[in-house]
Every structure is written in structure tokens, then in C-alpha cells.
Amino acid sequence: VCFNKIKTATLIACITLIAFLPLALQLLLDESEQQLMSRAVSTPLIVGTKGSALDLVMNTLYFVDEVPELMTMADVDRIEDSHLALPIPIHAKFQARGYPIVGTTMDYFDFRGLAIANGRSLALVGEAVLGATVANELELKPGDFLVSSPENPFDLAGVYPLKMHVVGILAKSHSSDDLAVFADLKTTWIIEGLGHGHQDLLKNQDASLFLDRTKKDITANAKLRLYTEISEINLDSFHFHGDRSQYRLTASLAVPTDPKSGTLLRGRYVSQETLIQIVQPAEVIDGLLQNIFQIKNVIDAIIVL
């Protein structure tokens, strides 16, 4: 008798699970669709290097790990020079303690309607503003520090992690911005190794630092200290190498001045010769959701069988 009761209870549980699973899956998909589409619809255009449009959109909107092919600041300058849209460059390549570091400009905060809940906004290179969830999970507040994670911890010759000063915490926005660490573009370029600060060689008398020293030129060796923290004391020593127009980014938002300008801007990227693409995030995410719903229909059919 006891065995029959257990068998009956197990059968009822299985039937209940089978009946509930499609409903639970539908609720999950509906919530995911709302979250994905709301952010995509609010973002008019994304510009990036040709490749996977989905990778470009997912990294730019949701800061996922899959980094698209990189573009350059020259591509951003072309958008600005067109006078058809406001470019908002984004460099979302690096992480800090598992959260994406998003290098951008102050226009991003205005565009997303992000507000500071505690502390202040970005003002200097090396500063960071944290999304609400990041601050809560890592238990950080203005005045604390957050160190960037190396791309490859086993690369001993790689770029040193940067110790960033936390200066502000964003109010909760219920979006992927809550899960991001925001910094100035120059900060992310320093993390990438395009800029650095070091001891003043002209004032330093330590002979062990020099490979060669003449009246005109100074060549330092590996003993020269590279700063991994930016402060008021060493801020002036930080400088960048190379052509700024060739500095790399993961993408740029493009906010048209009006619908007609948006159409004209898209037309400039139709040519097959250009290495840059411009996409409408809503179209890309809608295509992704259609594929997901097709898979869901297959699962429903299997459950029914």
C-alpha cells in the first residue's frame, strides 16, 4: 500500500512538472524579451567593425564577455564630422573582479538617464563610477579602490592591472548598467597599455635606471617604475603613445539628431568596401528572440509527445 502511494505521488509530481514546464518557460521568455527589447529599442544605432552584428549589440548593450572586432577613434570622428548623429564611444573589453569595465564619455550617462546616488561623477583619469549592483555585491563605496583584472593572468609581460579610485555609485536603473564599472576612455586605454605614467627621468639620478643617457636622449631599462595607480601626485606623468585616431574601441552608439539624419547616416555604411557596419539594435535582438521562440516551440512539441 505504501509503495502504491509513493508511486501515485511520483506520477502526480511528474504530470504536474510536465504541465508547468511550458508555462514557466513562457514566463521566463516573456521577461527576457521585455528586458532585452526595452534596452534595444531605446538605442537608435550602434556602429562597429564588420563581423557578428549580434556580438556587437550584446557587448555594447549588455556588456557580455564576447568582445567584437575593434574599431578606432577615427571611425567615431567620422560620425561626429557627419553632423548627423552624436557619437558615444564605448570600450567594453576589460573587467574588474568579474564585472565589465565600460570606458565611455559623459554623454553616455545623459543618454541613459543615469544618476549618481552617492559620491560624484567621473572627473579624472583613473576614476571609476560603479553600477548599483556592483557596489552592493563588492561592498564598495566612494573612497575605495577597485583593481582591473589582467586579460591573461599568465602573461607576465602583459599590462599591469590599474588600481582605480571609486568616486561614485549610480542609482539603480534596473538595466545592465547596474552591473558595470564605468570609467573614462583614457582609463581603459591605460589598462590596454596605450598610456602610462613613470618616474621623471630628468629629475632621477639613479644610474641603475638608464641603459643610455646623453644630453639629448635618455633610454631607461626595465627597472623604471610604471605606475599602476593614478593620483594627483603622478597624474602629470601619465601620457599616451601613438596616434589617438588609431586608439581602439569596441563600438560607438550613434544618436541621430532626427529620423531623417539616422537614415542618411545608415546609408553611408551600405558600401561593401567599408570595414564598418551600422546596425539597429532592435532588429538584431528581434531576430535573436525569434530564434529563441522557435527553439521553445520545438521543446513544447517534444513535451507534448
Annotate each language-model stretch with its function.
Residues V1-C2:
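A short amphipathic helical element positioned immediately N-terminal to and/or at the very start
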Residues G98-L146:
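Short beta-strand boundary microenvironments
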Residues P22, Q26-P100, D107-D110, L124, ...:
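Hydrophobic, regular-secondary-structure patches
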Residues A92-R97, N118-V129, N152-S175:
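Beta-strand-rich non-transmembrane domains
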Residues K7-E31:
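Short, strongly hydrophobic transmembrane alpha-helices
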Residues Y160-P161, I169-K296:
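Mechanotransmission and gating elements of multispan inner-membrane complexes involved in transport
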Residues P22-Q26, K296-L305:
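A hydrophobic alpha-helix feature that marks transmembrane segments and, especially
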